[in-house]
């Protein structure tokens, strides 16, 4: 029973770190990256639709993103949605494709992005710690029910703590790499 709790906690911590990595992908660094548009929703025939489902997005150059809509009539809506998303990007529409040139980040904007990265990192750490707390609570319930001994409880609790430390270190490492990427000129 204790092994199941440990395995479940490990899987949940892994998912929390994976979610954090996906979240960081939407934070814009100095170069073009299609994932910055992941959260952009376009009002397409009255339904909010992710831009990635409406267009082919390519990165032909380091600082250029090209969006080629499958339906040419939606090009204006896609452009409006990108502007409305307030990503600090200025799309230019030539009637068939939308080009987004990524300007070089200012020092101030870089510092703001680092703050965002740190905020996301803290949220990910809280998620990992919540998984630890839930796992420890489950173990205590098992011990109260007599399914595991007090020594087993202590051992499993230590194992969960080791996993927690491992995943928090992973979050810190990912954050450090992203900060380095952002501060790179």
Swiss-Prot record:
> What is a single cellular component term in the Gene Ontology annotation?
cytoplasm
Q: Which InterPro entries does this entry report, sorted A to Z?
A: Ribosome_recyc_fac, Ribosome_recyc_fac_dom, RRF_sf
Q: Where in the cell is it found?
A: Cytoplasm
Q: Which GO terms describe its biological process?
A: translational termination
- The main place the protein resides is cytoplasm
| UniProt keyword annotation of Cytoplasm present | yes
What this protein is reported to do is described as: Responsible for the release of ribosomes from messenger RNA at the termination of protein biosynthesis. May increase the efficiency of translation by recycling ribosomes from one round of translation to another.
Q: This protein is called what?
A: Ribosome-recycling factor
Organism encoding this protein: Bacillus cereus (strain AH187)
């Amino acid at each position: 029973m204790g092994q199941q709790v440990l395995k479940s906690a490990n899987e949940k911590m892994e998912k929390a770190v994976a979610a954090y990595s996906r979240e960081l992908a939407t934070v814009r660094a100095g170069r073009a990256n299609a994932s910055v548009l992941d959260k952009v929703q376009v009002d397409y025939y009255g339904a909010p639709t992710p831009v990635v489902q409406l267009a082919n997005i390519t990165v032909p150059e380091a600082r250029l993103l090209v969006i080629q809509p499958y339906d040419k009539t939606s090009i204006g809506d896609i452009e409006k949605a990108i502007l409305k998303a307030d990503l600090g990007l200025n799309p230019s529409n030539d009637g068939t494709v939308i080009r987004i040139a990524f300007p070089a980040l200012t020092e101030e904007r870089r510092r703001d992005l680092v703050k965002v990265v740190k905020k996301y990192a803290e949220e990910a750490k809280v998620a990992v710690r919540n998984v630890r707390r839930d796992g420890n609570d489950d173990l205590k319930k098992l011990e109260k029910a007599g399914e595991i001994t007090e020594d087993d409880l202590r051992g499993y609790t230590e194992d969960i703590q080791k996993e927690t430390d491992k995943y928090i270190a992973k979050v810190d490492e990912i954050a450090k790499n992203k900060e380095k990427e952002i501060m790179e000129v």
